[in-house]
Amino acid sequence: YRKLLESKDIDGVIISTPLNWHAPIVLDALAAGKHVFCEKAMARTLDECKAIYDTYNQSDKVLYFCMQRMYDEKYIKGMQMIHSGLIGDVVGLRCHWFRNADWRRPVPSPELERKINWRLYKESSGGLMTELACHQLEVCNWAAQKMPESIMGMGDIVYWKDGREVYDSVNVTYRYSDGVKIAYESLISNKFNGMEDQILGSKGTMEMAKGIYYLEEDHSTSGIRQLIDQVKDKVFAAIPTAGPSWRPETKMEYTPHFIIDGDIHVNSGLSMIGADKDGSDIILSSFCQSCITGEKAQNVVEEAYCSTVLC
């Protein structure tokens, strides 16, 4: 890659390599005077992230990391709704990403195992955290408009006991200074719940990946009102002396509203659940435009840095 960077005909480069190569190539590319677009996460270690961040701030070159949710229309509009108070105060954040696949790719020769399946080994990957959680933690900080102050978590190799080094199951809790918490979970041996970035507010809930929100006022029946309705509908022959005065509330009883008006075509697969355009093409187009104008993107490097250090 160093020979490529020596070319004066090249204005910018796209880096799509194993994570442990991000920092060396980004730093060399900036030093060579190239604009840079790099896959997430920012880098493998905290020191590498700091080196990239500091170098970028001293450079006049453009640097992007593929945080495509920042360019996804439903995420942008959803965040505007959240910050305008539509769902009230943000009181909790819940994110999950579930798959059912071993994350392996075919290896034609044993000596290529760690190069092809680099995501499975600690020297080249942070596992589920850097490969998946990085995107979702950026969304949480975006909604909360700050960084967590403390973290606790655990991970294990629960199912794919095939010689891999990174966990196939992780649970992490992040706490903000005001007590609001992120509950994060990811595993790759069950895909039932798919992927979601859920923002919980005192007046409603946003499910960002689906582009849907629910308002608490759409469903607010008191316990005594429920009991009266049950009697009225002859669910009970008489008022019970020790019967229930409430029933469990479930999401299905809330009215969903689309973040973006009009038809939203939803796709589902191993990687994403969301609108057809998830922001990936837009952020890449923005990078190309920045290469022409030299104008730096707002907050992309900062968000990539903050979400990566949480992984």
Tell where the protein language model's regions lie, with residue ranges.
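Generic hydrophobic alpha-helical segments
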Residues: 26, 78, 287-291
